[in-house]
Curated annotation (Swiss-Prot):
GO terms for molecular function: 2 iron, 2 sulfur cluster binding; 4 iron, 4 sulfur cluster binding; electron transfer activity; metal ion binding. A motif (Cx2C motif 1) lies at residues 209-212. The C-terminal domain binds 2 Fe-S clusters but is otherwise mostly in an intrinsically disordered conformation. Residues 172-186 are annotated as: Fe-S binding site A. Keywords: 2Fe-2S, 4Fe-4S, Cytoplasm, Iron, Iron-sulfur, Metal-binding, Mitochondrion. InterPro entries: Anamorsin (IPR007785), Anamorsin_N_metazoan (IPR049011), CIAPIN1 (IPR046408), SAM-dependent_MTases_sf (IPR029063). Pfam families: Anamorsin_N (PF20922), CIAPIN1 (PF05093). One of its GO terms (cellular component) is mitochondrial intermembrane space. Its cofactor is [2Fe-2S] cluster; [4Fe-4S] cluster. This is Anamorsin homolog. The keyword Protease does not apply. Residues 4-129 are annotated as: N-terminal SAM-like domain. Component of the cytosolic iron-sulfur (Fe-S) protein assembly (CIA) machinery. Required for the maturation of extramitochondrial Fe-S proteins. Part of an electron transfer chain functioning in an early step of cytosolic Fe-S biogenesis, facilitating the de novo assembly of a [4Fe-4S] cluster on the cytosolic Fe-S scaffold complex. Electrons are transferred from NADPH via a FAD- and FMN-containing diflavin oxidoreductase. It comes from Drosophila melanogaster.
Amino acid sequence: MENFKGLQKSLYIWTDSADLDKRVEQLKAATGGDVALENVHRLSFSSYANSSFDLIVIECAQLTDSYVKLLHMLKPSGKLHLVSYIGPAASLLQEIKLSGFINCREDSPDALTAEKPGYETGSSARLSFAKKNASAVNVWKISGDDEELIDEEELLDEEDKQKPDPAGLRVCSTTGKRKACKNCSCGLAEELETEKQSQKATENAKSSCGNCYLGDAFRCSTCPYLGMPAFKPGEKVQLADNLLKSDI
């Protein structure tokens, strides 16, 4: 028991009273502290406070449900020492580990030692990863005014802002102009003729309510502009040929 030197308060759990005083004196000499006595059969009725002892020694006893209680009775980093135990060492070591002890080991063929963790049961500790990183916090303090943003208008030239003329989108592949050649075979002649006929048909199309340009919500049920987007007053809008023909 030289490893227990300096432990101030110990509990000796006994089963046989023969030479009990001698064993207690040996434990006092090894630890240099006070030793309390408790009978193994009275252990379940005892009312020791938690974290009361630095060392608990059990001699010639087999415990099944009391290791957890002994764990609470020990101070953090306190030691449990079993001498002349009953049963296989491997089974006892596993039972002690499952009760919450650590560093369980077999010191000799008839002695086992275990330790209580260095913290009290139910205690808490602050985790390091919960600390806020100062640099990460400062990121949210960056002002948007410090960022140099590109003006979207500077990305466009004056030519980009001009709308293309629909009349000049398609030209003849031969003349390079929007005018069909004599023997047109690209379809431009038919397209120009269709536009011409449509223009003639829609020249006399007038609004009877004056709200056609506002959109479908303001148009009557027979409005020829139904389905078309809103347009500016006086803006020329080309209607399809089938909208000017009677359904009957």
